């Protein structure tokens, strides 16, 4: 047998290219394993071979080659929960990316092989931790296609794999992430109360206030004071005045009042969130506030910011309404 002669770093790429060659040329004649190994040897030496063989024989040999390859580079049994003789194109891209064979993976997808990034990341997270993941997405692979990075980022936050999300936004790959995915990552960070991710992104990117609207409201509703303050600070100092004025029409203060979060109320008012509509909510009885102490505390904050004459004028109406 000539298998030991084959460099294990090249073997997987060779057999995959052979498989594609067979499919492209519709080769279906029979061949034995010895002849197949001779064919591989000839390809390594860049020689042309006229040997023909059937697809089944080759695919079985491909799977044998995969075992040979993975045993050479790691102790991880990549086939533990996988249908061994699946002969599915996705199977090969899954294997290549899972073991960090990036050149092979790029070759596969460039030749139309499909892959499921969610399946790959979930497997890595469950079985491999960060070791193989870092090997796959190391900053050395900065020529990695943007679509692959964004697919991976989206799969990471969609599957709630926090450490993978954190890795991407701290790596040099972050410049390749689309605006839509960045906003989704911030929204995910708000949901899991990870202020570090948010701080990194708001420092690296300039957002329009409207980008913040949904995630900002969610931060207030989550009672997350630190994240709300971080977002407010970014809005105040990294957006233009016109955008900020539009943003101030949000209902964040209403949520803070309903949740009786006085620190949040004070924070929002101090950052110049408009309070006119809050007084209006009181007058219309739109807020379910039946505790006089609670109402007094809210009005105290409003008095400090809003025109005192207007606030005092409305005070009696508000109290009577409740």
From Swiss-Prot:
Keywords, in A-Z order: ANK repeat, Repeat
InterPro entries, per database record: Ankyrin_rpt, Ankyrin_rpt-contain_sf
Pfam families named in the record: Ank_2
ANK repeat residue intervals: 88-117, 181-210, 248-277
Name of the protein described by the UniProt record: Putative ankyrin repeat protein L897
Organism: Acanthamoeba polyphaga mimivirus
């Amino acid at each position: 047998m000539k298998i030991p002669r084959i460099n294990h770093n090249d073997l997987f790429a060779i057999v995959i290219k052979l498989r594609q060659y067979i499919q492209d040329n519709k080769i279906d004649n029979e061949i034995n394993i010895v002849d197949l190994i001779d064919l591989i040897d000839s390809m390594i030496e860049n020689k042309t071979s006229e040997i023909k063989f059937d697809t089944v024989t080759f695919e079985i040999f491909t799977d044998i080659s995969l075992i040979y390859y993975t045993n050479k580079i790691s102790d991880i049994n990549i086939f533990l929960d996988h249908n061994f003789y699946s002969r599915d194109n996705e199977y090969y891209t899954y294997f290549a990316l899972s073991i960090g064979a990036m050149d092979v993976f790029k070759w596969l997808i460039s030749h139309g092989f499909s892959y499921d990034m969610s399946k790959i990341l979930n497997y890595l997270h469950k079985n491999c931790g960060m070791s193989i993941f870092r090997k796959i997405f190391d900053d050395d692979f900065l020529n990695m296609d943007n679509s692959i990075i964004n697919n991976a980022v989206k799969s990471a936050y969609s599957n709630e794999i926090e450490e993978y999300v954190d890795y991407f936004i701290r790596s040099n790959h972050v410049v390749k992430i689309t605006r839509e995915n960045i906003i989704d990552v911030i929204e995910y960070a708000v949901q899991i109360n990870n202020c570090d991710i948010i701080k990194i992104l708001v420092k690296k990117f300039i957002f329009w206030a409207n980008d913040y609207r949904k995630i900002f409201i969610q931060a207030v509703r989550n009672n997350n004071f630190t994240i709300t303050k971080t977002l407010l600070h970014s809005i105040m100092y990294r957006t233009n005045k016109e955008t900020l004025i539009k943003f101030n029409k949000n209902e964040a203060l209403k949520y803070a009042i309903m949740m009786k979060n006085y620190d949040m109320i004070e924070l929002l008012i101090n950052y110049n969130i408009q309070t006119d509509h809050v007084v209006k909510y009181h007058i219309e009885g739109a807020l379910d506030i039946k505790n006089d102490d609670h109402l007094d505390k809210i009005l105290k904050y409003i008095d400090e910011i809003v025109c005192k004459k207007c606030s005092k004028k409305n005070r009696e109406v508000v109290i009577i309404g409740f």
